[in-house]
């Protein structure tokens, strides 16, 4: 078993991004990331704090706007439009989930697709499925970087993705297909799941069930990517994969924490820098 060290790869990418940001600044462009947080969800506050910290570390101009839980949908949409129109901001991120009185669909649709660093706008989803992506959801994008860094061969391989969310499962499956893997999407209603997972050369698990995947579910030598984050009764973090068991049969595996998580935030930064570069090139033409 070899560990896929997401923390180390994220640090390496951050150093490379800082160099790119410095070059953009020399050329007169300061990449900007605007983050909007509605309400006081503790997990969301941690995520936003981590994103802002990393943005500052690589030299981005970052803004975090914290809005009360009671903010109206209209007010939120107006704020997004201000960021859309401003050339100061190249990436816009609205932290999910949102309060029930605000339509997530309307909010995601309101963000300029070229500034949608989360990759959740329907236009960006459509471009991904058409094989011509502009912005890609950051968790699957980070996983693809891991595959590149660790020289994981995808072409012709059998890949199983457990989970069908728009955030991870669906875009992950599409990226694997674009890399010429043969892909199966499984989910909570899939029957005979073990029959599928035992055939997978690449197994990506994003179903939100604590240590559900055991050694008996995994093919010898498989590459296992664990997207899950679950806390046990003692508050300890675990993935959807039973790491202690599965590491004995996998050729490569991501730990939780320290695997996929660090890469997710780094890819948000990468897409912000890419958006700023694209804008600068447009302006110079």
Curated annotation (Swiss-Prot):
Gene3D superfamilies: Leucine Dehydrogenase, chain A, domain 1 (3.40.50.10860), NAD(P)-binding Rossmann-like Domain (3.40.50.720). Pathway: One-carbon metabolism; tetrahydrofolate interconversion. One of its GO terms (cellular component) is cytosol. Disulfide bonds: none annotated. One of its GO terms (biological process) is tetrahydrofolate interconversion. The keyword Transmembrane does not apply. The keyword Transferase does not apply. Its EC number is 1.5.1.5, 3.5.4.9. Catalyzes the oxidation of 5,10-methylenetetrahydrofolate to 5,10-methenyltetrahydrofolate and then the hydrolysis of 5,10-methenyltetrahydrofolate to 10-formyltetrahydrofolate. NCBIfam families: PRK10792.1 (NF008058), PRK14179.1 (NF010776), PRK14186.1 (NF010783). Belongs to the tetrahydrofolate dehydrogenase/cyclohydrolase family. Homodimer. This is Bifunctional protein FolD. It comes from Lactococcus lactis subsp. cremoris (strain MG1363).
């Amino acid at each position: 078993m070899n560990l896929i060290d997401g923390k180390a790869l994220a640090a390496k990418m951050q150093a490379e991004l800082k160099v790119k940001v410095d070059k953009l600044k020399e050329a007169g462009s300061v990449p900007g990331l605007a983050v909007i947080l509605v309400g006081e969800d503790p997990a969301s506050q941690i995520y936003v704090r981590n994103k802002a910290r990393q943005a500052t570390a690589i030299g981005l101009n970052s803004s975090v706007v914290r809005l009360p839980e009671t903010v109206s949908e209209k007010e939120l949409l107006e704020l997004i439009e201000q960021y859309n129109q401003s050339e100061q901001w190249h990436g816009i991120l609205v932290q999910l989930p949102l309060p029930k009185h605000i339509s997530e669909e309307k909010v995601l649709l309101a963000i300029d697709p070229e500034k949608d660093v989360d990759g959740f706008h329907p236009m960006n989803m459509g471009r991904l499925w058409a094989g011509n992506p502009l912005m890609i959801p950051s968790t699957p994008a980070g996983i693809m970087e891991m595959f590149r860094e660790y020289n994981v061969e995808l072409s012709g391989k059998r890949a199983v993705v457990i989970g069908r969310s728009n955030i991870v499962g669906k875009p992950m499956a599409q990226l694997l297909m674009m890399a010429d893997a043969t892909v199966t999407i499984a989910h909570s209603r899939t029957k005979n799941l073990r029959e599928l997972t035992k055939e997978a050369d690449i197994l990506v698990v994003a179903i939100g069930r604590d240590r559900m995947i055991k050694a008996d579910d995994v093919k010898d030598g498989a590459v296992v990517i664990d997207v899950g984050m679950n806390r046990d009764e003692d508050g300890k973090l675990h993935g959807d994969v039973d790491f202690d068991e599965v590491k004995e049969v996998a050729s490569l595996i991501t730990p939780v924490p320290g695997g996929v998580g660090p890469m997710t935030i780094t890819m948000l930064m990468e897409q912000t820098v890419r958006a700023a570069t694209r804008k600068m090139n447009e302006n110079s033409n």
